[in-house]
Amino acid sequence: MKKYFLLACALGAFGVADAATVQFSRPDKKLVVTVADDGGRPVYRVDYGETTFLAPSPLGLLTNIGDFSQGIALQESSFAVSPVSGHYELPTIKRSKVDVQATKAVCPFYEDGKHIFDVVFHVSDHDVAFKYKMYPQGNTLCCVVKEETTGFVLPQGTTTFLCPQAGPMGGFARTSPSYETSYTAD
């Protein structure tokens, strides 16, 4: 019953009852990602527990072979979710031994019945990452991304810490941009 309630809330949040919508989470069920095609525009949303972390936010690409930010549909029947687990070690990072437990979700988008791209999500207990996987279109051998329309919409009242981005090749030993620049609370 809770699963149906969450799905109904997600559909209402996107404002389109007939939009294709998929939802996936980590095994702890706290971090939930919802992907939909809101009137032909791909969007995603991230919730953590009862809190909206990212409101419905745009996905998409403008390329030399087409505008894939609108007029496309999420293909629910081809949606796939699988667990990811692994271990790696890097001696030069703060936590040198890392165990990975995550969920991989492949969200396929189509235009006029043709597979355009997948948005491949990697969701762990406290992280969300995604990438685009493009598919060949006709005889075009190369797809050039002219603009990415991906964005994120923070909920009303969100507070953040913003850090100015240093220009490249500046700072000590020309190592900028670095993450040690000053920041102020908003």
Predicted regions and their residues:
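N-terminal accessory beta-strand-rich subdomains and adjacent acidic, glycine-rich linkers
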Residues: 23-186
